[in-house]
Structure formats: C-alpha cells, structure tokens
C-alpha cells in the first residue's frame, strides 16, 4: 500500500519538484501583489497570510497533478525526464495523495480563514490548469498556451479577492497583463526546446507553424503587452513611477522580441524567456512600490 507518510529525504525533494516551486513562487508573488493593491492602506494581514498559504497549496496541488497526467510526455523530454513521475520513482497513488492533501488543505484554509469567493476562484483555477489546459488543450492545439493561459493569469485576482472579497475591473487588468505575457514567455521556451516538444508529440506553435511564424507572434504579443501594461496608469490605479517602469521594462521586452524575429538563435530565444520572468516580477514589484508611494504621500 502506497503512502506519502514519512518519505525518505530524497523522496521529499522529488515531491517538491512536482510542485514546480519556482513557478509557484512567481504565481504566489503576483497574488500577494494583488492583495496589497486591493485596498488603499495596509490589508488585513491575517487574510494576506492565509490567502498566500491557501493559494500556494492549491497551486502546488495543480502542478503535481499536471506532472502525473504528463508523466509519459515528461519521460520523452530532456527538460522534464528527471521528475519522479517520469522516472517511475513516485507512483500515481503517491502523487494523488500528495495533491489531494495539498489541495484539500488549501481549500479548507481559503474557505474558513479567508472567504468562500477566493476558495471557489482558486479551485476553478486548479481545474482550468490541471484539467482543461493539461488534459484537453495542451495535447490538441498549438493555441494551448493562449486559451489555457487564463488559469495561469488568475493569481492577482485570487489575491485581490482574498482581501476585498470582490474582483473589480482593476484586478482583471492585472490578470490581462499576465494573460498577454504568457504566450511570448512560453513560445520563447518552445523555440529553443522545439525538438524536445517534437519528441513528446505536443503541438506547440514552432512545430505546427514553424519558427518564423512563432517569432512573429512573439513580436506581436510583445507590442500588445506593452500597450496593456499602460492600463494601470490610464485607469488611475498607479502613477508616474509605475508608468516609467512599465515603459522601460516593456521597451526591453519588445527589443528582445524584435531581435529574435529578425534573426533566430537559441541563445536569443533563451534570453527572451529568462528576461520575461524577470520582467513580470519587476513589473508587479513596480505596481506595489508605486501604490505605496501614493499611499504614503497622500
């Protein structure tokens, strides 16, 4: 009988890998930014704490389920072949137990210590990623990351709901930013990992439509992202400090995309992918800093 009780130290690390901690950290960071932007002053710290814990637990559960569903795909890809699910060192029953424990705990925390709205929105995000994206979209359409990107874009709305028990237009603007950011971020990865995805049999855009078309889409999305990131300023959510950061960070993003479009190399694609992660973290950091500058100077 399989159990996740008292695992070996090496197994603990394998469990952690299944939760994709780096991706989870960025998602939770964006959720926390949403929490602090939801109110003019300091948010209820109890809701911030338990909202963060609950969202992290459900995100980790969703990623673990993703690894279970994609274990055969992961085994064919160099980037993911070392995951415990791909190597067979962690059984499906163990992953289901882990995900059930994390997800169940997360839902209880959000429902009882935050609010039901956040719990249901986070659960819907879990289903959107673990089922709709992983099972239905990813293996069937090159637009998988576009359509399925909504679930990955939800953290700011989840954070906002944690504190305000509502999801107003301002929260959806933050969701829109991540939604538009997602395709160029993942397509940059898919470009320099094309053969990996081909071996896995996944219909990623560089495989179905070629490198040139993918690079064109990345460039177009980078322009759209630049425009969308100006919305917080024009909607009076943030001030000039944020606007300056958005223009500089967005300009660098567009420059990377233009260079990649004009002349492809794996290194240029890799640089864009890495910068896109830094970009999102810095952009959301600028949202928070500008917000607090406004609060303190009011």
From Swiss-Prot:
Alphabetical list of PROSITE patterns matching this protein: UBIA (PS00943)
UniProt cross-references to Pfam families, sorted A to Z: UbiA (PF01040)
One record GO biological process: heme O biosynthetic process
GO MF annotation list: protoheme IX farnesyltransferase activity
Pathway it works in: Porphyrin-containing compound metabolism; heme O biosynthesis; heme O from protoheme: step 1/1
Gene3D superfamilies xref list: UbiA prenyltransferase
CDD domains recorded: PT_UbiA_Cox10
GO annotations of cellular component type: plasma membrane
Compartment(s) where it occurs, according to its Swiss-Prot or TrEMBL record: Cell inner membrane
Membrane topology type: Multi-pass membrane protein
Catalytic activity: heme b + (2E,6E)-farnesyl diphosphate + H2O = Fe(II)-heme o + diphosphate
Entry's transmembrane regions: 23-43, 49-69, 95-115, 117-137, 144-164, 171-191, 234-254, 276-296
Keywords, sorted A to Z: Cell inner membrane, Cell membrane, Heme biosynthesis, Membrane, Transferase, Transmembrane, Transmembrane helix
EC number: 2.5.1.141
PANTHER family tied to this protein: 4-HYDROXYBENZOATE SOLANESYLTRANSFERASE, PROTOHEME IX FARNESYLTRANSFERASE, MITOCHONDRIAL
Family under the similarity heading: Belongs to the UbiA prenyltransferase family. Protoheme IX farnesyltransferase subfamily.
Function: Converts heme B (protoheme IX) to heme O by substitution of the vinyl group on carbon 2 of heme B porphyrin ring with a hydroxyethyl farnesyl side group.
Misc. comment: Carbon 2 of the heme B porphyrin ring is defined according to the Fischer nomenclature.
Name of the protein described by the UniProt record: Protoheme IX farnesyltransferase
Gene name linked to the record: ctaB
